[in-house]
Amino acid sequence: MTKKTNLLCIALMMLFLCARADEGMWLPYSINGQNLADMQRLGCKLTAEQIFSFNQPSLKDAIVQFGGGCTGELISPEGLLLTNHHCGLSYVQAHASVEHDYLQDGFWARSKAEELPNEGLSVLFLTYIEDVTASVLNGVTDKMSEKERDAKIAENSKKLRIEKKGKRDVRVEIVPFYHGNQYILFVYDEYKDVRLVACPPWGIGKYGADTDNWTWPRHKGDFCIFRVYTAPDGSPAEYSKDNIPMKSKHYLPISLKGVQPGDYTMILGYPGSTDRYSSSGAVKNIIDLEGPAIVSCRTTKLEQYRKHMDADPAVFIQYASKQASVSNYWKYYIGQVKQLKQNKVYEKRLAQEQDFRDWMIGNVERAAKYKGIFDEFDNYWNHQNQYTKALIYNREAGWRGGEAVTFALRFRQLNAAIEKKATPDQIKKLAQGMKPSVKDFFKDYNKALDRDVTIALLNLYYKDVNPDQLPTMIKKEGDKSHGDFTAFVNNAFAKSILVDENKVNAWLDNPKSLSKDPIFALMYNILESYWVLSEQAETVSKDRADRLYMEGLMEMQKDRNFYPDANFTMRLTYGSVQDCEPRDAVTYSYITTLDGVMAKYKPGDWEFDVPKDLIKLWENHDYGQYADKNGDLVVNFITTNDITGGNSGSPVIDANGNLIGLAFDGNWEAMSGDISFEQQVQRTICMDMRYLLFIIDKMANAQNLMQELTIVK
């Protein structure tokens, strides 16, 4: 009986451990014995060299940094690249029109000749890594001020980048880790000819939209397919009709086996930013000031977007990508503030700081080294809290609020040249160089929408920000109009050249000072206020305290396997497929199915409409080889992996190195995860590869793509 009880306890303990989320965004080149042991315990069958190597093809060679904000992966020998729909949305939107509505209807290139080039899109392949901490910190002393320290680090880093780059056409970056306690050099090959191959209809790729965003259960086919092209010799190149599809050094086979609870999962990608070693003051600032300010401004903007997008299909196409961009982190901050409170992250940070104090004062040398860092934190946040709200409103409701105001920023250099009386040739060169960006701006610009957005945001700005921190123009006009900027904005839009493409182009042909243009003047007044507030806010720094606190935590917890905060460098996270129990008596299954898609279906609804072709396949239960053992078509699944923004589009890889999913989101219960990892409830939301293949094969009948893929059964 005792033996059976012990065995049961062990089994339950193992189940509990497996159900916990697996914390850590690890640098893949430095995976150590503890990480490998954990990975093998979870089921990984790959060696470290098979995962990451500069000596042989490895998983690393299939992973790209996509478009400066996402991740993608190669899935064919000819450079076929998979990422998320929301990562590719702006490029799809740029090709869309009312006549060719690729947003609503999707896009499928039936041959390489039909693939669409994308100006400004590039992908990066990692080719070299080196720890350069000693070189970067050469000549840096403890007696230096932070300003002197930063200048020396910048000088050393610039020299190293130049040396490493040489005459090669590569991108070299030196990135700080652990709050400046370590510096690593990365070298990338940049490929600038990346063409759109396929994207699903809106009712698949954007299914659930804002309502479902950041939540589980989910039912979204969040994918987009591109292709990387190279020069004929295989080197990176700008777009050219003579370019050829990339010959992939490594690509990911796609598994049809599906997922079960406990299955090993690994994700390689480029997580953007976390702050898991921050002080309690940073957490309180987000809860009380930063989060609410961003949500308030973006709520106001989104209300105007929806009003105009719902009224006009052409405006919907113009603003679909913009709306998605604004709403993504609008909902993120709503969830983050809620879960930081719910999960008592501020209280946990206070407790950690008390542990640090107790450890610090237990040793004379430690006390001397770390003394004063908490006073520095307190001083910084007491100062910063006076400026956080004003700076956020200045950005979100000011120079990045209305589009015309943001557009005016582009004319600063040219206007400065005019006012400083540059030569006619210099002015002409600058003016003509702006014409392509003018065309690009007005392609997706709606004056009526922007006018309403600008009015609403300036009304909010004036109402919510302390009068002495308002830009002088907004203060003056708000006082005069009792906070109603309707007449002011209407007048500005009537008189400014910056809301009319023909007038802007005519001005570029004969440019004169824009200083009296009402929108340019508004932009400059807002920007000047931002500079003043920023300068005042930056008079107090916490860089030294952050660096020493990080060093001290690592010294205090010597047995802990620390990983660095995310900073848009390649990382590896490992875990497993698991259910989620977010609260008492609530359990979420690890998968969702096409039945769930249809249960949410709302004909004509912008969030929950479903393409007719998909409905027909569901009605006929025509899933083919993509059904699971129960005959269902799995759409999404969840894992215990540790990801954040930037990981969008990352591959979910099984124990054998096959692609089983596409990571695209995190869950609501763990929205505090960028600040504090939530062991019990943190989940990564993934699209099942069987759903991807089903859409390509059965719905789109894109057999040209199916023939390129390596499918493992």
Feature annotation, model-predicted:
Residues 2, 18-713:
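Terminal presequence/propeptide segments associated with secretion/organelle targeting
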Residues 9-16:
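Bacterial N-terminal signal peptides
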Residues 1-8:
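Bacterial N-terminal signal peptides that target proteins for export
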